Amino acid sequence: MFGNLKKKLSSAIQEGLVISENLQQQYRQRVSSGNSGSSQASGITTPISPLGLNESLSSSRSSSLSLSAPFQLTDGVPSHLNVAAGCSLLAKYEDDWQQIHGANEKNAEKAAQIANQISGIQDQASHQHRIMSELNSSLAGIPTLIAQLQNSSQVLNSLEEMGKQLEIELEKLEDLREECELQEFILEQQFQLSRHKQKKLNELEQYRQQIAQKHQSKIKDQEQTLLKLQRERQAVFDDAFREDMEEYKQRGQLTKIQTTSNKLALEEVVLEANEVETKDALEQFLNG
């Protein structure tokens, strides 16, 4: 936008310069052709007014024209004609354009700032809009959420009941497990007891066999001892019998062997304490 305006102002300045040069050339041609300067000057001044010349500009430039009168006279231009009016106007337009350009740059900066602010506001509005949309969707889902919460509450209640039932079943299972462990312990103890009993029986059998072997060996030893004694007694008896037979053959009779038996009197018997008690009990029984 500002570039187009600058181009238009530049083209206007160039056109103004071209027009001023054409005017100077026309004045020079008319002066050289011998026409009256007053009539032509009046005819030339008339088209200047449409270019935006006014009395304030001609009065402001009168001092500069009076200083440049010799130059204009040499060129054939009247002294009361303001040839630099277009340049002053163009300079004024250029100054105005520079001011406008500066103001436009400031406006552009402010517009950029405002655009940034608008973008920020738009972003905030979009964010708020998105939040509102999410809030609306969330609010729209509240009934469904309430229904789900109710279902969840029912499920939790059912789970609580199932948990209680599960605790009861777990207690039963624990009791059953303890009972099974007790039975296993009893069976294990019975098995250990049976093993111990069998072990003791085996040991007892081994001990009995050992005792039996020892007893058999003792019996054999005793039998051998008795047999030896019997043989010795038999030998003694045989010797005594032969002696008796020899004596009988020689004398015709046998000598009597006197045996003395040790007899005890009743007064000589001494009873111990247990025997005294037994005697007292016997007397009470007989007297009773």
Swiss-Prot record:
Name of the gene: Dysb
Chain coiled-coil ranges: 147-239
Family classification: Belongs to the dysbindin family.
Taxonomic lineage of the native organism: Eukaryota, Metazoa, Ecdysozoa, Arthropoda, Hexapoda
Record's keyword annotation contains Coiled coil: yes
Entry protein name: Dysbindin protein homolog
Role, per record: Component of the biogenesis of lysosome-related organelles complex-1 (BLOC-1) involved in pigment granule biogenesis and membrane trafficking in synapses. In response to high synaptic activity at neuromuscular junctions, stabilizes Pldn protein levels and, together with Pldn, plays a role in promoting efficient synaptic vesicle recycling and re-formation through early endosomes.
UniProt subunit comment: Component of the biogenesis of lysosome-related organelles complex-1 (BLOC-1) composed of Blos1, Blos2, Blos3, Blos4, Dysb, Muted, Pldn and Snapin. Interacts with Pldn and Snapin.
Disulfide-linked positions: none
Keywords of this entry: Coiled coil
Leader sequence segment: none
Cross-referenced PANTHER family: DYNAMIN N-TERMINAL DOMAIN-CONTAINING PROTEIN, DYSTROBREVIN BINDING PROTEIN 1 DYSBINDIN
Gene Ontology cellular-component annotations: BLOC-1 complex; neuromuscular junction of somatic muscle; synaptic vesicle
Domain of life: Eukaryota
InterPro entries registered for this protein in UniProt: Dysbindin
Biological processes per GO annotation: adult locomotory behavior; eye pigment granule organization; long-term memory; mating behavior, sex discrimination; negative regulation of dopamine metabolic process; olfactory learning; positive regulation of synaptic transmission, glutamatergic; regulation of neuromuscular synaptic transmission
